[in-house]
Swiss-Prot record:
SUPFAM superfamilies membership: Fibronectin type III (SSF49265), Zn-dependent exopeptidases (SSF53187)
Name of the protein: Probable zinc metalloprotease PTT_17836
Organism: Pyrenophora teres f. teres (strain 0-1)
Pfam families reported for this sequence: Peptidase_M28
The organism's place on the tree of life at top rank: Eukaryota
């Protein structure tokens, strides 16, 4: 599991400013009238945003997600004893090599049902000792990659997956048991189950289902795959990482079976100083591509409950609570308490619900047009107009665009303005304008599928430029 200390939870904090007594800094002007608080919240422009309802194909996909299949995959992966990155790659029944062979065969079974749309490959490299204390001898690191080609926009990729390597208390113990049931057979099981189901469908954009290796040594497999895509100029629009999605119970026994955490990077790690300055100038530090992807997921997938250094947008799903007596622990009993990442800790119903959230996300992303590009808002006009412009995305045809907005205290988009198929818009509201709310612009495609929103960056020119 990747430490959450390097990531930010995809949510905003509500700040409430309160004083025990009124503050009147200008006593000489005490007769001056001030705006009534009844004017807040702001009047609505457009309409209230509603969560996306699954279409018939997505409903069918969700109905096919099998708890039994997910459980079977997790138990099988745990049965290899250890899947440590440094463990045997030749033993037919124990170690990461045996797990890789089995996973490859299972992904290939899915591909065989796809009528040629899905292919299965390995993304492999040799990692040498030197700059990583958890690599003590040269080792082959292989990610299993199942690629389902898009039917209309195959050059736009969306990727999801978990890591199939595991570890125990000692990060370089590659011989001792490390069943890795929750961390992260639970994530790999989701990736494999969705590959099995999606192979029978034709998403418009390409979807990649993966099982990464080398995660416990520092996200090595995921980083190499992302760099491979970058070197090949692949348009990887989003990466959805599944790292521990199988247990809702905390160490103190608290359960939270109907929530899942979503970690989203703030200001992109690869963003240059000039872009960051522009972002901060308009208060956009909470509207990075990853966080707007998180808002998209909240909109399209929340109903299912009832990779950064390469410059790609990525988020990570993880269960609501963690129990550190199970995670990265030797399989042992101490003082009558069982330790270790064992299958007995799994909540398979929870794992299945998590799979439905991911399925909703991937299907909705792959069937929507790409997000608009070069999205801007004119910040030079000192008036109540908010002038926007953007460019149409490549790939799938766009039926129209929407402006989303939310008050600055809101974590999620609350309202939407339907614009039609235009590439600029003047919002003339005296209250809903660039000084009062956060805006985003998104594409709308056939069937009402929508892209994640894009934060408009500042530009300056005469009106209607």
């Amino acid at each position: 599991m990747r430490s959450a200390s390097t990531l930010a939870v995809c949510a905003a904090t509500l700040l409430q400013i309160a004083c025990s007594t009124p503050i009147h800094p200008f006593h000489a002007r005490s007769h001056q009238s001030y705006p009534s608080t009844e004017q807040w919240p702001l009047p609505v422009v457009g309409k209230q945003l509603e969560h996306q309802v699954p279409d018939e194909d997505l409903q069918e996909i969700l109905s096919q997600i099998s708890r039994d299949n997910i459980e079977s995959t997790i138990r099988k992966l745990a049965s290899f004893g250890t899947r440590h990155t440094l463990s045997s790659q030749t033993d037919p029944v124990r170690g990461i090599g045996a797990a890789r062979t089995w996973l490859t065969a299972k992904f290939q079974e899915a591909a065989d049902e796809s009528e040629g749309r899905m292919t299965v490959d390995w993304n492999s490299f040799i990692k040498y000792p030197g700059d990583n204390e958890r690599i003590i001898f040269p080792v082959n690191i292989t990610t299993v990659v199942a690629t389902l080609k898009g039917s209309e926009d195959p050059d736009r990729y969306y990727l999801t997956g978990g890591h199939y390597d595991s570890r125990n208390s000692n990060p370089i113990d590659y011989q001792g048991d490390a069943p890795g049931a929750v961390d992260d057979a639970s994530g790999v099981a989701v990736s494999l189950e969705l590959a099995r189901i999606f192979a029978h469908y034709k998403p418009k954009a390409t979807i990649v289902f993966t099982a990464f290796a080398g995660e416990e040594q520092g996200l090595l497999g995921a980083q190499n795959l992302a760099q491979t895509y970058k070197n090949a100029s692949v348009n990887l629009a989003a990466m959805i990482n599944l790292d521990m999605v199988g247990n809702s119970k905390a160490e103190d026994g608290t359960t939270d079976p109907h929530n899942i955490r979503l970690f989203c990077q703030g200001t992109p790690l690869t963003e240059n100083a000039s872009t960051t300055t522009s972002r901060l100038s308009i208060g956009g530090d909470n509207d990075s591509p990853a966080r707007n992807l998180g808002r998209f997921i909240y909109e399209v997938a929340s109903n299912a409950w009832t990779e950064m250094t390469a410059g790609y947008t990525g988020v990570r799903f993880v269960q609501p609570n963690e129990d550190y007596t199970q995670q990265h622990q030797n399989v042992t009993v101490r003082n009558g308490k069982q330790y270790g990442d064992l299958t007995q800790w799994l909540d398979f119903e929870y794992n299945t619900r998590a799979a439905k959230v991911v399925a909703s996300t991937m299907w909705s992303l792959a069937n929507a047009p790409a997000a608009p590009t070069n999205v801007g808002v004119n910040t030079t006009m000192s008036d109540n107009f908010s002038q926007f412009k953007w460019d149409a995305p490549k790939g799938l045809s766009v039926q129209g665009y929407e402006i989303l907005y939310r008050e600055t205290i809101e974590p999620h988009w609350t309202n939407v303005i339907d614009l039609g198929n235009v590439t600029w818009y003047n919002l003339t509201s005296a209250t809903i304008h660039k000084d009062n709310v956060i805006f985003g612009v998104r594409s709308v495609g056939k069937g009402g599928y929508k892209s994640p929103a894009v934060l408009p960056f500042p530009f300056g020119c005469a009106r209607n430029c």
